[in-house]
């Protein structure tokens, strides 16, 4: 058999082996077997030394042609197998877009956040501006500007977290009132602000007390403001949160920064006003405190109490949540038990 015939035989056999190779490993093995240093094509090339000078160039050119043809077939088959592997992987990872999606568990607003948001929406609809005050406050704004002199019992160290002698964690969102009064331009209309936020007291945590809780303070100042305006606002708040079926009453009380002062009660949720242990047989439950802004508070902000008046009210979203949903321990709101909190979530 001539060298050219041997090369043709090796070419045909190699192309057949390449075509039948179904994995890259087999393709690579064909390359080593045919084109390697110890392969048959290399052996044929070594035999060219026995050829005549006239035959040697022809056989050499044909040998290169065979080698190039085999290498091209190897490259082509390798590319086919690599693409097939990619296609197989893509098919395995293919998503059926017609299948229903898997619902991802979502978080939800905390029950107290829901109540705060509900009240913010209510009051913004009435023209109030939402004010976010500082939780770290000056003693001057937290107490003195609210008609709480230095010897007032509420300023005792056991009730307040002091950071320095003159700086503290605010005990009430009422501390936002003085700054609102100072900064408002009454030539542009009445002052109507709502101040929600966290406040701090040196209380021992129990079923009804917490060292950190929430307050919402409302303040309205304008000419010709009366107690009737305050009463109408409080009734609207109570009925929005608790429902129209509950009555609201005002009774006299005392707060240093309002005069006169009142407390608002609503019909007991548990007994519908008949009297029970929860309402201490009165048929009423206290929900918030309020009153007409004290003239001295207005004067300290440079406002003439003879020309302007106003009302203020403060309520606790934590307490509202306890009353509205019948929760008997305020600490339950802060244990982060999703099973407990999820029952209060209102969609939409």
UniProtKB/Swiss-Prot annotation:
A Pfam family it matches: tRNA-synt_2d
Subunit structure, as described in the record: Tetramer of two alpha and two beta subunits.
Residues binding Mg(2+), per UniProt: 259
Protein known as: Phenylalanine--tRNA ligase alpha subunit
InterPro entries from the UniProt entry: aa-tRNA-synth_II (IPR006195), aa-tRNA-synth_II/BPL/LPL (IPR045864), Phe-tRNA_ligase_II_N (IPR004188), Phe_tRNA_ligase_alpha1_bac (IPR022911), Phenylalanyl-tRNA_Synthase (IPR002319), tRNA-bd_arm (IPR010978)
Organism placement in taxonomy: Bacteria, Bacillati, Bacillota, Bacilli, Lactobacillales
Keywords assigned by UniProt, alphabetized: Aminoacyl-tRNA synthetase, ATP-binding, Cytoplasm, Ligase, Magnesium, Metal-binding, Nucleotide-binding, Protein biosynthesis
Annotated disulfide bonds: none
Catalytic activity from the UniProt record: tRNA(Phe) + L-phenylalanine + ATP = L-phenylalanyl-tRNA(Phe) + AMP + diphosphate + H(+)
EC number(s) given by UniProt: 6.1.1.20
The keyword Manganese belongs to this UniProt entry's keyword annotation: no
Cofactor: Mg(2+)
Predominant location: cytoplasm
A biological process from GO: phenylalanyl-tRNA aminoacylation
